[in-house]
UniProtKB/Swiss-Prot annotation:
The keyword Coiled coil does not apply. This is Putative carbamate hydrolase RutD. GO terms for molecular function: hydrolase activity, acting on carbon-nitrogen (but not peptide) bonds, in linear amides; triacylglycerol lipase activity. Gene3D superfamilies: alpha/beta hydrolase. The gene is rutD. It comes from Pseudomonas syringae pv. syringae (strain B728a). Transmembrane segments: none annotated. It comes from the Bacteria. It holds the Pfam family Abhydrolase_6.
Amino acid sequence: MFHEFHACQHADAPTLVLSSGLGGSGRYWADDLTLLTRDYHVLVYDHAGTGRSPAVLPADYSIRHMAIELLALLDSLDIQRCHFMGHALGGLVGLELALLRPELLHSQVLINAWSSPNPHSARCFSVRKKLLLNSGPEAYVQAQALFLYPADWIAANGPRLADDEAHALAHFPDTDNLLRRIHALETFDVSAELSRIHTPTLLIANRDDMLVPWQQSRHLANALPNATLVLLEYGGHASNITDPLPFQRALRAFLSTQP
């Protein structure tokens, strides 16, 4: 899979692996790299079947497949221990990593994640699939901001959104791949296994998230044996982009306590 390794100036710094959401592109984390590389070597990657990682995804593709693909990448780079941060679908990958290879993870940060399907998110993904199949990629991409960002942020960031949408359209994934990735997150359910995950975990959720109810993170915080929840008031589904300072404070406070 396509990946980029952003080195910290401190050679002995720990490694932090970043996993993006449904779009799958490592580009999602661009705004965070300057801060994170002060203290960490940072690995970003494009998920299989997205962006610069071309692949034909199998019909039974799952979040576990995604975790196994990431493990293969980490093995190829001889990364034996790391911190992990995942956004939405990327957070689900983190939960699978913690189940498949718990000794890999120093800690994990899960942003607006969940452990099982919920009716609201299911409705959102149903609408997005219909947009893709009935109106095409352009409508799908233009609607994406409505699910990710607060209304006032959208209104104030037209030029950035136009650039992001042009890039997304230019690198739009194969329709079958995208539908299989959506199906993977729609059917993901590790609720019965959460008590097995002892990895130190920070859950960051946003009260105004239009895509994933923040109560999903509260459930994770209650079910995981070693988890902390930070609930942010503003930022939508992607507050590391829309309101980065509160997000960064929560992230740094947690990571500073991890070895």
